[in-house]
Amino acid sequence: MQGVKKRVEKLHDLLNQYSYEYYVQDNPSVPDSEYDKLLHELIEIEEKYPEFKSTDSPTVRVGGEAQSSFEKVNHDTPMLSLGNAFNEEDLRKFDQRIRDSIGKVEYMCELKIDGLAVSLKYENGRFVQGLTRGDGTTGEDITENLRTIHAIPLKIKEPLNFEVRGEAYMPRRSFIHLNNEKEQNGEQPFANPRNAAAGSLRQLDSKLAAKRKLSVFLYSVNDLTEFNATTQSEALEELDQLGFKTNQERERVSDIEGVLNYIEKWTSKRGSLSYDIDGIVIKVNDLSQQEEMGYTQKSPRWAIAYKFPAEEVITKLLDIELSIGRTGVVTPTAILEPVKVAGTTVSRASLHNEDLIHERDIRIGDSVVIKKAGDIIPEVVKSILDRRPNESEIYHMPTHCPSCGHELVRIEGEVALRCINPKCQAQLIEGLIHFVSRQAMNIDGLGTKIIHQLYENQLIKDVADIFYLKEEDLLPLERMGKKKVDNLLLAIEKSKEQSLEHLLFGLGIRHLGVKASQVLAERYETMDQLFKVTESELIEIQDIGDKLAQSVVTYLENSDIRSLIEKLSNKNVNMSYKGIKTTEIEGHPDFSGKTIVLTGKLEQMTRNEASEWLKMQGAKVTNSVTKSTDIVIAGADAGSKLAKAEKYGTEIWTEAAFIEKQNGI
């Protein structure tokens, strides 16, 4: 079991690092397929050994950060990603898990459109706001650009309040036309329709977006309170009736064999479509069964995305470059002769670690096979031995850090080489980049290039130095005009007000993720109280394991860290928790902790208003009646939900009874 525990800890380290590089830095060091593989491994371990699953596990994260070109807006409910399946075995495991949980099941199969996920909000039947997915929690407001898409109705037939989600995409014909125009104008063409769609929707001038001829397929309703659907297929049919564009190639199947037949059909037919797809989405069709299965923090348990097999090409490995991460891990990266893979030109691919290089016998000068698992980030699959040059040599990682010259070490149980010098320049810079990221101190405008300049000009050596920067420090930097400097200084000043959990996460304490930072901040409230905490005390807290407890205490006992905190405090950086404590949330005694379903037409308020009020009282409002539903509030013309409530013996209230409870009568 000790070996399993060490592997879980290693997977946590790797996945957190890769997620940070990809979603926060926008500078991934590994291919998406490697991340998916490691995540898949961790999921399987956690399923087999539930005692090793923690609330800050990478399997509950949703990685990723919204761009800054448009206003950032929080989603009413998170836009979760889907779990991935890459082969028949993965799909059969998913099916078995579903049937073990809810018994007999019917699936809805839908094409996975290769575009940009969007969320559209309607109030009284009018389109009022459109957001990108962003990091799943916060998206970009691209309403004006979405209004230019003719497939999105600006007003629907009924005065409903809801949010509908889907995929904006560029049809292949529009893509070809756009790239022809760009080439004629001497501009760089887009690599693929997906990039073109994303770039078009991020145009600040909506007139330019309008010229791009985008379209959209809608695939889910976020809040079915005002809908009558009891299945995914019925929900899509209702969207059709309201005037929305849904994908008509969907198919309802009775079992996993039907799913496999659907995948086989579209694997061969995908080229005949007028738009790109990168897989198939499989969902449990019955909405009450979806409700029963629920969600992880990362994805719904009742759906999965099958990814089409990756395209493979051959190119030459020109060199191996090394990079050092925030935790000191040294990662080798293949420098490749540029080659087109799945629509984009690839010139770099991660080699992960020395063990993988030796296992695959990859050498500089080799002809290598490259693929994009998931059609996103490239990886080196293998060398082609019969093309190997006679003078090739086995590659060996250096013995000393390429940044600071300190001796590299391999910690027992790990495959990575690490630089353990706390003053290593590369690590310090990566730590600074982490500190200013959105989930940490969220200092908008302080990007990677500026941090490099500040460090190289000896203007910052640690995170506290950021708060001592002045206008005269910033103005001489490259591409830093007066307005940009003023905005950056305002962002730095604003970040001082961040709640304690953001500071804790930003400090980069080993093993301390976003969730655990929140737990510690809420429990201890101030940095002063955290300084007094003991390892044995931390271990008693749910979600804080032995390794994290030891890491936190060791970090906070360090005299250099205490000096750093004092330096931050001297610049009035907030050291207190500003959120609402879980224990302080009080709701209406008749509703708090209850699972409630609204159905039918209410006279005194809309169902949306009733839903919001109930949530404020601590109730959980769901769309489907299940055996776990506590109360069904039925208005006029209540349909199948009322019938199901009667079948289950669920408590049923009229609107009048609900209002009496509201008023305490």
From Swiss-Prot:
HAMAP family noted in UniProt: DNA_ligase_A (MF_01588)
Q: Could you identify this protein by its name?
A: DNA ligase
Q: So which domain of life are we looking at?
A: Bacteria
**Name of the coding gene:** ligA
Under the heading NCBIfam families, the entry gives: dnlj, PRK07956.1
**Domain BRCT residues, every copy:** 586-665
Described by its record, this protein's role is as follows: DNA ligase that catalyzes the formation of phosphodiester linkages between 5'-phosphoryl and 3'-hydroxyl groups in double-stranded DNA using NAD as a coenzyme and as the energy source for the reaction. It is essential for DNA replication and repair of damaged DNA.
A Gene Ontology biological process in which this protein takes part is:
DNA repair
Cofactor(s) required for function per UniProt: Mg(2+); Mn(2+)
Q: What is the lineage of its organism?
A: Bacteria, Bacillati, Bacillota, Bacilli, Bacillales
Residues annotated as the enzyme's active site: 112 (n6-amp-lysine intermediate)
